[in-house]
Regions:
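Conserved core of the sugar-phosphate nucleotidyltransferase
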Residues: 2, 11-99
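Short aromatic-hydrophobic micro-motifs that form the base-stacking/packing surface
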Residues: 4-6
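Basic/polar N-terminal segments that are highly enriched at the extreme N-terminus
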Residues: 52, 127-128
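Alpha-helix initiation/capping motif
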Residues: 72, 106-107
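Catalytic donor-sugar/metal-binding loop of nucleotide-sugar-dependent glycosyltransferases
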Residues: 86-105, 111-126
């Protein structure tokens, strides 16, 4: 009836997150549950950069807004996903999210990402 896809690059994943995601899935009208993480800084104050290295505000209307006054934004944690199989296969997609802590998430695409995952792991689990 349901499936969980756990990504191999999620070494900080906790069983509790999977359980919370499952409970959210079965007790909601969502077809999928995605763990999400809050961006550490409001993306509405983000910059873009052109090929000459010149930077510009992606949203210039927020250039003078204090960061603490801007709405939070979230990104996929890249750890796991829950799906109701029949709705997923039929394309009837309605996603719900569960928020997970930034210190337990690390996207791993580069060697530097792996080093950050090791640092977070030591911070969370190594006593000494």
């Amino acid at each position: 009836d349901n499936m969980c896809c756990i990504l191999a690059t999620s070494p900080l994943l906790l069983n509790e997150d999977i359980v919370v995601g499952y409970e959210r899935l079965i007790h909601s009208d969502f077809s999928s549950i995605v763990p999400i993480v809050q961006f550490s800084y409001p993306i509405l104050r983000s910059y873009g950069m052109n090929s000459e290295g010149e930077i510009y505000f992606n949203w210039p209307e927020y250039a003078k807004t204090r960061s603490q006054d801007l709405e939070s934004a979230y990104h996929d944690s890249g750890t796991f996903y829950w799906h109701k199989i029949d709705r997923w296969l039929s394309g009837d997609i309605k996603r719900g999210g569960i928020v997970v802590d930034e210190d337990r998430v690390q996207d791993i695409d580069t060697e530097q990402d792996w080093k950050m995952a090791e640092i977070k792991y030591k911070m969370l689990y190594v006593r000494g």
